[in-house]
């Protein structure tokens, strides 16, 4: 059984920033960056260019930013483990963390596990149907696949993520359709203007994909218009979901207070959770801002809160 003063679960901007601050405070943190549960480095690993992170006037690729943060955390003594924490016991002291058959203990814990992309429950989108055979939730991860080249592609969603995915896919697809169930977008004006100016992007308003069909790969979709109540079949090679995220909190087993959507509840103005010694940072506790810079800031808060807790 391995013991650490501080364990950080998660490896996005929140987790790495917490590790930087904690290691500089000589807390020798152990950071579990994940393995099977999701890509190490969090959602920014699937983002192309990040243009709004301070200090990079020309922008920076998401994975490069995460690599830099990881290197900085390790420079100050953070131990990074490519393992998943699958269960926790916060009812005992020290806390007990499970990773497969391994057991770890810690005096304080920062949860920075982020959130995962949601998927539509429609015919053809299941794991045993066309998931990863033309249906995905990450254009950056999968968009360059040969199956999408010079084909009609469809992005479901109306926020910034949906438009970013659509613009990325114009590099590969013949046409990219943004399918939105309303007649206005939630995305920022800057993103809307960019997408509307792209001659390869088209918008299907008041529309919903109700079925995905194909053989070994996606070949077509059925689109329902919720205004005129008609259904149209269109050729398609790819369907990309960009409809929001689900916080990665299931492994906590209800031991930390969550809101109705599964996000960790933290005390106002702090990273403290309902369990003393357990702190939360990043998108796992933030459903409003969801930015790399705010995640990093909350990671700093969590490290400082953990340091004060351990001192007392």
Swiss-Prot record:
GO terms for cellular component: cytoplasm. Binds 1 FAD per subunit. It is found in: Cytoplasm. SUPFAM superfamilies: FAD/NAD(P)-binding domain. GO terms for biological process: cell redox homeostasis; removal of superoxide radicals. It comes from the Bacteria. InterPro entries: FAD/NAD-bd_sf, FAD/NAD-binding_dom, Ferredoxin-NADP_redctase_2, Pyr_nucl-diS_OxRdtase_2_AS, Thioredox_Rdtase. Disulfide bonds join 138-141. The keyword Cell cycle does not apply. Its cofactor is FAD. It catalyses: [thioredoxin]-dithiol + NADP(+) = [thioredoxin]-disulfide + NADPH + H(+). FAD binds at residues 33-43, 283-292. One of its GO terms (molecular function) is thioredoxin-disulfide reductase (NADPH) activity. Belongs to the class-II pyridine nucleotide-disulfide oxidoreductase family. The active site is a redox-active disulfide bond. Homodimer. PANTHER family: THIOREDOXIN REDUCTASE 1-RELATED-RELATED. This is Thioredoxin reductase. It comes from Chlamydia trachomatis serovar D (strain ATCC VR-885 / DSM 19411 / UW-3/Cx).
């Amino acid at each position: 059984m391995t013991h650490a003063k501080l364990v950080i679960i998660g490896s996005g901007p929140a987790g790495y920033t917490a590790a930087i601050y904690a290691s500089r405070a000589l807390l020798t943190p152990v950071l579990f960056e994940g393995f099977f549960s999701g890509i190490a480095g969090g959602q920014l690993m699937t983002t192309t260019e990040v243009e709004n992170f301070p200090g990079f006037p020309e922008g920076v690729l998401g994975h490069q930013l995460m690599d830099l943060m990881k290197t900085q955390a390790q420079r100050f003594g953070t131990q990074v483990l490519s393992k998943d924490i699958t269960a926790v016991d916060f009812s005992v002291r020290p806390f007990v963390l499970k990773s497969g058959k391994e057991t770890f203990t810690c005096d304080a814990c920062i949860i920075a596990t982020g959130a995962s992309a949601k998927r539509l429950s429609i015919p053809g989108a299941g794991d045993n149907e066309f998931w990863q055979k033309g249906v995905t939730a990450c254009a950056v991860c999968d968009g360059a696949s040969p199956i999408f080249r010079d084909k009609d592609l469809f992005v479901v969603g109306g926020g910034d993520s949906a438009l970013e995915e659509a613009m990325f896919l114009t590099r590969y697809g013949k046409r990219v359709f943004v399918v939105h169930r309303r007649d206005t977008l939630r995305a920022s004006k800057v993103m809307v203007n960019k997408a509307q100016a792209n001659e390869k992007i088209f918008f299907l308003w008041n529309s919903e994909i109700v079925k995905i069909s194909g053989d070994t790969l996606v070949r077509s979709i059925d689109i329902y218009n919720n205004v005129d109540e008609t259904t149209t079949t269109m050729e398609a090679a790819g369907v990309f979901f960009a409809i929001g995220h689900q916080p990665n909190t299931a492994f906590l087993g209800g031991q930390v207070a969550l809101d109705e959507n599964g996000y960790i509840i933290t005390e106002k103005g702090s990273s403290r959770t309902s369990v003393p010694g357990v702190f939360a940072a990043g998108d796992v506790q933030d459903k409003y801002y969801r930015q790399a810079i705010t995640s990093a800031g909350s990671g700093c808060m969590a490290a400082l809160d953990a340091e004060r807790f351990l001192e007392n």
